[in-house]
């Protein structure tokens, strides 16, 4: 992480000492791409008794951060909101796998397939994204994360990239990364176009720069970090759950406490982004340029890093700020044509640190500035600086100074991220070797150096250091989310649950020694800046050697075990049964903290009794909101345990495992022999079995949700469509005749011969809003389940309410559910929507007379505005 300190970061040592072994053995399922093992809602039952008190509970609290108000730049904010260009290609019908299903494009002539390597390196940045992910994200194990970032400052600071294997957003290395990626596209756009990776590259660059714009709410205020590095590094868990574990403070620089290095680097990134998007999205380009100019003026005015303190110990600005001021000024000159920027670049360059025997990196960009200035001016000051630097990395300088080479050929600079330095120096060498100012005698030397360093990274030694590429690649990177621990322990599970495809690990020591272990952050951590120069190098090599890319590519994985419930009998007798139940949340596709987690313990009511004759009490319960006996059909009943909202999540020993002990009075001990358990996440069955009305245990079908025992709405056989397309609809409800929400798990299947445009689909659900209170819509989960087994989540679903006038029978309000993304619903594909309609105060509805509740054919499906299923209320 640091440039020259060569000291172990204290938080890293703390992790290794503090994290403890633990865990639960888990099994892998073969369901591809599903976020939940089943999609069956909790069957309808009626409440007979509720116990709301608990004797013990586990809770955690963290210090709240002081809120900071800030001004905004109105014109800039408006420009950002109006920008709607996609982050990546829209037509992602399914989430592919890292192996893909074939190759396309120009076959390569190089030693390695640089097209595939480039493709995978870009995917890594999608896996590092923070915030609300777009629907075209090519992964089923990454989810939305850190959606409250900036709330302590009254701002939306969501987005950006997580730095490395941690969950902090450090803007200095992030801006450097976005700058280098942008430089690569600027330099070798044709390589990205030919390999069909331009949209992905631009999507990643835009993702970072849109975040930087959020971080700059006023002329002289810039938020440079979100998350406390020490607190973050003291916890080992997935990014999707970090905000439930700790506060994420926001840190800023301003006129009183400036930070010229980080604001200068961000100005460079935004200037490059403005160039790249000038012809694609002019409005966004102008917004980027406006912020770039403002941030540069801020950095140039104060020339101080006095306020840049929160990153100390992680990303200190060792080289100062003049290198960033020179580097950013050249890019602003290229973006604007304003010669004053070129003059400032030349003025500040000699004031920057001039270490020729290091590498272009997040801290020191003076060599990057020298390359650009050599291209712009051809002056010897810059060409000689670049060549001395590259001579050091290749044949040696005139005075005999030369980089250390490992026995197997890696140009080795430092123990922390050795490959990051070598591949970035190789990128600089490849760019300079093709420039007009490079002496002909050195062109091949620099180019061959670039090829050789890429070869070392990709497999020349018998192993690839790029995850998911080549032979014998690393499988235990130091990365919290990819490792997938649920118990705050980097050794549990022992094998990473996810493949962090495309990431370049730190690399070997000076003797080619390398240890593929999660605990070694020197050699096996990954980081955004590690891949930056490496990506540029791959694109440059593609320009000469080409290479094919994978079709059906992505970070889609088979879903492993995510939930489990273990029960045992604590005690029992002829008239009571005491149960101990342990509920485990090991979710990882993606990791998540359920809003509603419900455990049900099903049993048979003794002959001669009813559920109302029984009572339940608890002697111990962790984060239990309520304990209730519910009557089912026939002689079945269950104990319903509702856990507190988002209390059970994969974040530690206490967080991922919840224990409850309860006693059922009136139930004999032998009832346990035929009992069963089921666990529901937001109304959908995720573990266990549900009994039918006769008491026999049935297992829900994995492809279609099982109907509840008393409230079923099977699909009608003859809907009345008026538009094109043919579908059937089934819906399962999680409530009975009354409740505080209309919660449904709806499946829409394309049974026709023609594909249906997902973007044109809408669903109208009709009901009565008796209290006329404010309404809210929640989509807990939505996805397309393909007939071939693939599964693609949808994150954009929304619901809009309309009054029906005059009122119809069973309907005075409609909820239109739409925004199912792009792509097609092919024949045999199913659109799954788990939704909830509720009042703002969660007051009850009378559900018994709702129009759409009376049958699935009373739910109207439209395609392109025309009804293709269902009947409107008359």
Question: Language-model segments: which ranges?
Answer:
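Hydrophobic single-pass membrane-insertion segments
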Residues: 22-39
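Aromatic (Trp/Tyr) and acidic
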Residues: 95-123, 127-183, 225-265, 269, ...
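Short beta-strand elements of extracellular/lumenal beta-sandwich folds
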Residues: 573-603, 731-732, 739-755
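A surface/secretory-pathway sequence property marking extracellular, secreted
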Residues: 605-647, 771-814
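Terminal connector regions
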Residues: 648-700, 810-813, 832-874
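Ser/Thr/Gly/Pro-rich low-complexity, disordered linker/stalk segments of secreted
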Residues: 34-107, 697-723
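N-terminal Sec-pathway targeting helices
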Residues: 2-15
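Low-complexity, acidic Ser/Thr/Pro/Gly-rich terminal tails and inter-domain linkers that flank the onset
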Residues: 546-576, 719-740
């Amino acid at each position: 992480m640091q440039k020259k300190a060569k000291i172990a970061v204290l938080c890293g040592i703390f992790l290794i000492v503090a994290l403890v072994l633990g865990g639960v053995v888990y099994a892998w399922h073969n369901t591809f791409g599903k976020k939940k093992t089943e999609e069956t809602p909790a069957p309808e039952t009626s409440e007979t008794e509720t116990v709301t008190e608990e004797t013990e509970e586990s809770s955690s609290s963290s210090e709240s951060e002081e809120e900071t108000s800030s001004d905004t730049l109105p014109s800039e904010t408006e420009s950002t909101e109006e920008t709607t260009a996609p982050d990546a290609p829209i037509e992602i019908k399914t989430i592919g796998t890292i192996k893909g299903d074939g190759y396309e494009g120009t076959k390569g002539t190089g030693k390695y397939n640089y097209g595939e390597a480039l493709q995978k390196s870009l995917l890594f940045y999608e896996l590092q994204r923070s915030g609300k992910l777009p629907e075209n994200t090519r992964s089923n194990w990454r989810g939305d994360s850190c959606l409250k970032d900036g709330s302590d400052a009254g701002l939306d600071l969501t987005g950006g990239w997580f730095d490395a294997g941690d969950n902090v957003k450090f803007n200095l290395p992030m801006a450097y990364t976005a700058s280098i990626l942008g430089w690569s596209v600027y330099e070798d756009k044709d390589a990205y176009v030919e390999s069909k990776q331009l949209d992905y590259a631009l999507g990643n660059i835009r993702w970072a720069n849109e975040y930087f714009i959020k971080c700059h709410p006023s002329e002289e205020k810039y938020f440079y970090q979100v998350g406390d590095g020490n607190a973050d590094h003291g916890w080992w868990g997935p990014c999707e759950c970090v905000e439930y574990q700790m506060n994420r403070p926001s840190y800023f620089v301003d006129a009183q406490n400036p930070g010229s290095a980080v604001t200068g680097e961000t100005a460079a990134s935004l200037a490059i982004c403005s160039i790249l998007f000038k012809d694609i999205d002019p409005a966004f380009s102008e917004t980027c340029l406006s912020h770039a100019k403002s941030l540069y003026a801020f950095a140039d005015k104060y020339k101080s890093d006095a306020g840049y303190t929160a990153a100390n110990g992680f990303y200190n600005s060792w080289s100062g700020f003049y290198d960033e001021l020179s580097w950013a000024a050249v890019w602003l000159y290229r973006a604007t044509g304003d010669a004053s920027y070129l003059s400032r670049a030349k003025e500040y360059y000699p004031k920057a640190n001039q270490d020729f025997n290091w590498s272009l990196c997040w801290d020191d960009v003076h060599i990057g500035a020298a390359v650009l200035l050599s291209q712009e001016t051809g002056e010897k000051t810059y060409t000689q600086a670049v060549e001395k630097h590259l001579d050091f990395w290749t044949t040696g300088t005139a005075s005999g100074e030369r980089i250390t080479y490992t026995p197997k050929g890696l140009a080795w600079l430092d123990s922390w991220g050795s490959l990051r330095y070598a591949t970035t120096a190789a990128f600089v060498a490849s760019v300079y070797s093709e420039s007009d100012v490079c002496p002909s005698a050195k062109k091949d030397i620099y180019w061959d150096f670039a090829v050789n360093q890429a070869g070392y990274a990709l497999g020349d030694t018998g192993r690839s250091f790029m995850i998911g590429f080549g032979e014998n690649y690393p499988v235990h990177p130091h990365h919290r989310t990819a490792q997938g621990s649920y118990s705050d322990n980097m050794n549990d599970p022992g094998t990473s649950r996810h493949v962090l495809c495309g990431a370049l690990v730190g690399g070997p020591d000076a003797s080619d020694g390398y240890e593929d272990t999660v605990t070694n952050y020197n050699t096996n951590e990954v980081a955004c800046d590690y891949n930056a120069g490496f990506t540029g190098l791959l694109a440059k090599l593609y320009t000469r050697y080409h290479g094919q890319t994978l079709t059906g590519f992505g970070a889609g994985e088979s879903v492993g075990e995510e939930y489990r419930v273990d029960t045992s009998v604590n005690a029992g007798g002829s008239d009571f049964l005491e149960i101990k139940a342990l509920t485990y949340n090991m979710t990882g596709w993606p990791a998540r903290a359920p809003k509603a987690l419900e455990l049900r313990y099903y049993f048979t009511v003794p002959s001669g009794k009813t559920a109302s004759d029984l009572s339940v009490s608890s002697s111990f319960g962790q984060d239990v909101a309520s304990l209730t006996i519910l009557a089912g059909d026939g002689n079945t009943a269950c104990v319903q345990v509702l856990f507190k909202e988002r209390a059970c999540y994969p974040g530690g020993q206490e967080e991922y495992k919840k224990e409850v002990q309860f006693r059922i009075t009136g139930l004999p001990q032998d009832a346990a022999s035929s009992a069963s358990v089921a666990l529901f996440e937001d109304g959908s069955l995720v573990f266990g079995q549900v009994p039918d009305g006769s008491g026999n245990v049935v297992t829900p079908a994995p492809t279609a949700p099982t109907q509840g025992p008393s409230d079923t709405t099977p699909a009608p056989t003859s809907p009345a469509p008026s538009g094109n397309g043919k579908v059937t609809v089934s819906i399962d409800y999680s409530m009975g005749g009354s409740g505080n929400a209309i919660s449904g798990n709806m499946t829409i299947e394309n049974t026709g011969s023609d594909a249906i445009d997902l973007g044109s689909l809408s669903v109208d659900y009709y009901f009565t809003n008796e209290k006329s209170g404010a309404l809210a819509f929640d989509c807990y989960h939505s996805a397309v389940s393909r007939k071939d087994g693939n599964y693609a989540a949808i994150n954009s679903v929304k619901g809009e309410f309309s009054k029906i006038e005059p009122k119809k029978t069973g309907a005075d309000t409609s909820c239109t559910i739409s925004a199912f993304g792009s792509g097609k619903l092919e024949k045999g594909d199913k659109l799954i929507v788990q939704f909830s309609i509720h009042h703002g105060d969660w007051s009850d509805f009378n559900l018994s007379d709702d129009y759409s509740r009376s049958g699935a054919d009373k739910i109207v499906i439209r395609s392109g505005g025309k009804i293709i299923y269902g009947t409107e209320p008359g």
